[in-house]
Amino acid sequence: VVAVLRPSSDSEINLEVWLPPAAEWNGKFQMVGNGGWGGSIQGLESAMPAALRRGYATAGHDTGHRGGGEFALGHPEKVIDFAYRAVHEATVQSKALVGAFYERAPRLSYFNGCSLGGRQALMEAQRYPEDFDGILAGAAANPHIALHAGSMARVTAVLKDPESGVPQAKQAFVARAIMNACDGLDGVKDTIISDPMACRFDPSVLRCKSGDRDDCLTAKQVDTVRRNYAPTTTSQGALVFPGLSFGGGRGIPTGEGGPPAPLILDTFRYLAHQDRNWDWRRFDIDSDPELARKNAGFIDAVNPDLSPFKARGGKLLMYHGWSDPLIAPESSVRYHASVLDRMGSDQGNWLRLFMVPAMGHCSGGSGPTSVDWVSALEAWREQGKVPDTIAASGTGATGARMTRPLCPHPQRATYKGRGDTNKAESFACK
């Protein structure tokens, strides 16, 4: 079923709902999330087919616009759609269509999203706790404005001084140096850094003694690497957004190419300055994020009070890869902590965060990074099986098949001191 939703005079939300034959329907509904700036029904190729194979009625939408962030220029209602309204309206109308088609409402509804979809997931739990019974929130691009401010600060510093860029060849060298320094902190040398927050790598040890080679860094490149992993702060030292984690050595600005990618640039030229010709060289870490928040602060899913979602029996399963080169993994740790600070430390019966060693952005990576998140969430919500561990599998850097338990944050998978380090049974959550 294809539909266009118009909850405001300037709304145009494109929605697609897939309905399996009645005999194959599992009685449930799954909404899938978006990525980047949305702008298309991005679940059509992967997420929606996966949901359909499980027997779900499933839906996706385009967040209320086409393309990148340029839609925000002169269209405040479309900004609201992108921020939160499109997901909610698409969910309400999709469930109505499902009910009409099968002549009964879905018995349970789930949301499954990563990146922008992760922010959408958190926004649903915060604003519309009645929409979903279980929510899967991966690598949330959140807070949207602070995330893009941190990226702008790192990228523009290098674009203004191209000699400070770190070429891809050197990024591989940096990644190896980080691995050599921190791989063994978890007790096992297996090319997996299980707890990057415990890594205290100092990039100055890579500085060239003379000249410039692929196996060392210039002084300016050392500063760039340090900036990449350090938190972005205002001129007064206030945190803007965490730095990337030492779980990997990628995502360092190269200094190559033109202006910052539209993904991050659009937040400031359209949301903040509302000027398509705004010059990125004028980016100011103190004033520009504040201007964006003044105009569209509702885009950030930062409310830590999820009491209504908890009260109706909802389950929120968060995850983030420690080697994410796009969104600092610590951002998920910080939001999870904010909920515990607000609601109390004992929330594990409905809220859990799993940090995945070696996983990149949303999925992939060299190691046990393949995870059946949906089954874990289903078992939790439908059978009361609290995910004390979740199984992960994959291929390591040496080509060996690996399995390992994922542990609810802040626990880590710890080697028992005996057994095959490629097998999950040799590890315990501590």
Where are these regions (language model features)?
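C-terminal His-loop and adjacent cap/lid subdomain of alpha/beta-hydrolase
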Residues: 1-430
